[in-house]
């Protein structure tokens, strides 16, 4: 039974690897994916939520 399951999984894996469609690449229109040389603020904004709950019992 394990051999049958293994054969099925291997067949499904190989069938998934043999897709005939072209690779999907997003259109960037000459723009980079991330902002390049973006200025980083010297100080973080004042209103930031606290990621750690700090209340005491």
Curated annotation (Swiss-Prot):
What are the boundaries of the signal sequence?
1-16
As for subcellular location, the record says: Cell membrane
Q: What induces it?
A: Specifically induced within macrophages by phagosome acidification. Induced at 37 degrees Celsius in minimal medium, suggesting that nutritional stress is a regulating signal.
Q: How does it sit in the membrane?
A: Lipid-anchor
Kindly state which keywords UniProt assigns to this record, in alphabetical order.
Cell membrane, Lipoprotein, Membrane, Palmitate, Signal, Virulence
Covalently lipidated residues (N-palmitoyl cysteine) read: 17
Q: Which InterPro entries match?
A: Membr_lipoprot_lipid_attach_CS
**Could you tell me which Pfam families the record lists for this protein?**
LPAM_1 (PF08139)
Which parts of the sequence are annotated with region: Disordered?
A: 35-57
Q: Mainly localized where?
A: membrane
Please report which positions carry a covalently bound lipid of kind S-diacylglycerol cysteine. 17
Q: What is this protein called?
A: Type IV secretion system putative lipoprotein virB7
